[in-house]
Amino acid sequence: MFSEKLLAGRNILVTGGGTGLGKSMAARFLELGADVHICGRRKSVCDETATELMDLHGGRVTSHGVDIRNALAVDEMVEAIFKDGPLTDLVNNAAGNFISRTEDLSSRGFDAVANIVMHGTFYVTHAVGRRWIANKLRGNVVSITVTWVRNGSPYVVPSAMSKSAVHAMTMSLAAEWGRYGIRLNTIAPGEIPTEGMSKRIKPGDEAGARTKAMNPMGRVGTMEELQNLAVFLISGGCDWINGETIAMDGGQALAMGGNFYQLRDWTDTDWEKARDQIKAQNEKDRSARQ
């Protein structure tokens, strides 16, 4: 689909690049000739991913153990990257989400999502963007959001609010920074199953089962489709796309709203079971970080 070295000479940072969607996009960028930086809280995971991707595709992947909720740590990482060679592109992928009745949410639960998705995404975008402007460099930012930035979603209110903030940031900075040759766009994918996220927002379901039943195309999305859209947006194939949120969900948002309204019929027992499964996944993730 793309020429073999389409991204040669590009230097791309992918947040949350050690696993899941971020890892997949990083792999495709590397395969197409880019130098890639990945960051995440678990440095060991990012190191393993960097080694794995370079073994598969060659090239250069640099890993950074950074919590993007920490603005100072983000700025130090970006400064170090720019000293080695300025970034050309940023992919804001790091995220967090879980389902909950909003009346059951704690402030800690809300902050766990908002601090990563809203604050963290801004911190990274700001640190990269102001260096592009100071050095008179063009750049591209692609952020991963959700289809419900347009219509909201019950039962994932921290994510709906935070992703909508990223959507607003994208439109606002596209207008403000466009004159510097800096473009910002977002991809709003439907369900592309990953282990951790699937167990937090669709606990108990077979991966993709609900989407397959409700989606006009009768299936979930694929990593390859996300990779291809991300590559297109940063490739320069159409530099006049700026400030857009592109849904990639098989038409589910159009047909069904693309959100979690269907959970209105859950009983207290259903919610208790979901909480237990989410807690188990969180414990598993904490153990992996130790």
Where are the regions a protein language model picked out?
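Conserved glycine-rich cofactor-binding loop
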Residues: N11, G16-G20
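Short, small/polar-rich loop/turn modules that mediate ligand/substrate recognition or access, typified
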Residues: V91, G178, R183, I241-G243
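Substrate-binding pocket helix/loop in short-chain dehydrogenase/reductase
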Residues: R101-T102, S106-A114, T211
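Active-site loop-to-helix junction immediately N-terminal to the catalytic Tyr of the SDR YXXXK motif
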Residues: L105, G152-M161, S172, M197-R200, ...
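Active-site helix of classical SDR
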Residues: T125, S162, T170
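Alpha-helical segment proximal to the catalytic Tyr-Lys
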Residues: R130, A175-R179, D239
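C-terminal helical subdomain
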Residues: T186, E206-I241, M248-G250, I278-Q290
